[in-house]
């Protein structure tokens, strides 16, 4: 079985890590050969190569870069894959324009709607990372037979190892050692909705004035978030750290992990928090309810409810939730491999 994995590698987020983990796990399977095509010099290229994956790095700028398209075609003609697996929308456009007779698989990680003439409809099979994503695709008219649900997965031991080196975020922020902190790790983009998290911080302050909120991530929402933090008088309680490479160490130092998304394919960073034994509070967006029990969830946009759940988790910490086996990288890889084989 020959598989050409394609990811634009434009950033390093959960989707790129899933592509890396899939390549790593498939390399352990007998009879599977694979090559990863991704952006030259990207974090995905670096990390996948460090895992031992064969990586074909290509120039890949913004937009539909013809240089990348040419080199994806070159990789297809040289490698002659049975399966061409696209891991994001840009990769899918490149993949569906290539020459050859490989079966086209595409992983859909977001619960956004797809248009009538979307390239996503060109795939032989779409992997939805949650039932919520599958339901959105089905509502948009994609045939159920063309969608398979394979949840994201992580390596819990890898997460724990990556969190071993202390970050000492309290010290960096000049906070006393015992200060309670609620942590969010997500890009600062509209669908992650950290504005609701900031408003939750305002609602929580009268009850727990010493609670600090830390947001790790970067993006277009930084300006509006900074303005809202200032408007609510929270500049000494809500801290925007920007991108934090040692995100797992940050999560490990938290007292509670918080997600405030209004749209979410699955929310795989929640899995990292569970692997580190942290209580999690989140909005019931997209696939998040497929990970967390109902008593850890609040409605999307409910800042008051989010504040209340965070305060409850701090005052009455829930029992440590065992890590669910269905969300391991090994389980994810087995599901994807079974799908590949079903197409041949």
PLM regions and their residue ranges:
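A conserved mid-protein helix/loop that constitutes part of the nucleotide-sugar donor-binding site
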Residues: 13-24, 180-203, 213, 220-226, ...
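Short hydrophobic beta-strand element within catalytic cores of glycosyltransferases
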Residues: 36-38, 279-282
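A short helix/loop element that forms part of the nucleotide-sugar donor recognition site in Leloir-type
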Residues: 160-175, 230, 318-320, 324
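Aromatic "clamp/platform" in nucleotide-sugar-dependent glycosyltransferases that forms part
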Residues: 243, 262
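Conserved acidic donor-binding segment of nucleotide-sugar-dependent glycosyltransferases
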Residues: 295-304, 311-316
């Amino acid at each position: 079985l020959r598989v050409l994995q394609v990811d634009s590698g434009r950033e390093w987020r959960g989707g790129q890590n899933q592509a890396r983990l899939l390549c790593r796990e498939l390399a352990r399977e007998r009879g599977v050969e694979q090559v990863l095509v991704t952006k030259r010099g990207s974090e995905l290229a670096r990390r996948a190569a460090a895992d031992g994956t064969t990586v074909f790095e290509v120039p890949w700028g913004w937009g539909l870069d013809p240089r990348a398209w040419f080199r994806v075609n070159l990789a297809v003609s040289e490698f002659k894959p049975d399966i061409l697996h696209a891991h994001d929308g840009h990769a899918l456009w490149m993949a569906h324009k290539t020459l050859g007779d490989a079966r086209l698989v595409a992983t859909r990680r977001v619960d956004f709607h797809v248009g009538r003439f979307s390239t996503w409809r060109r795939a032989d099979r779409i992997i939805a990372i949650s039932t919520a994503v599958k339901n959105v695709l089905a509502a948009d008219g994609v045939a159920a037979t063309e969608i398979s649900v394979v949840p994201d997965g992580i390596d819990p031991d890898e997460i724990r190892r990556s969190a071993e080196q202390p970050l000492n975020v309290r010290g960096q922020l000049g906070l006393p050692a015992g200060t309670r902190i609620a942590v969010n790790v997500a890009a600062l983009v509209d669908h992650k909705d950290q504005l609701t998290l900031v408003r939750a911080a305002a609602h929580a302050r009268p009850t727990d004035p010493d609670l600090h909120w830390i947001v790790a991530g970067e993006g277009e929402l930084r300006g509006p978030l900074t303005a809202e933090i200032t408007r609510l008088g929270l500049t000494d309680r809500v801290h925007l750290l920007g991108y934090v490479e040692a995100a797992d160490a940050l999560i490990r130092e938290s007292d509670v992990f918080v997600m405030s998304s209004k749209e979410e394919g699955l929310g795989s960073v929640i899995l990292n928090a569970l692997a580190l034994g942290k209580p999690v509070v989140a909005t019931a967006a997209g696939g998040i309810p497929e990970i967390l029990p109902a008593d850890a969830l609040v409605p999307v946009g409910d800042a008051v409810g989010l504040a209340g759940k965070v305060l409850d988790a701090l005052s009455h910490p829930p029992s440590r939730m065992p890590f669910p086996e269905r969300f391991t990288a090994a389980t994810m890889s087995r599901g994807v491999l079974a799908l590949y084989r079903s197409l041949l």
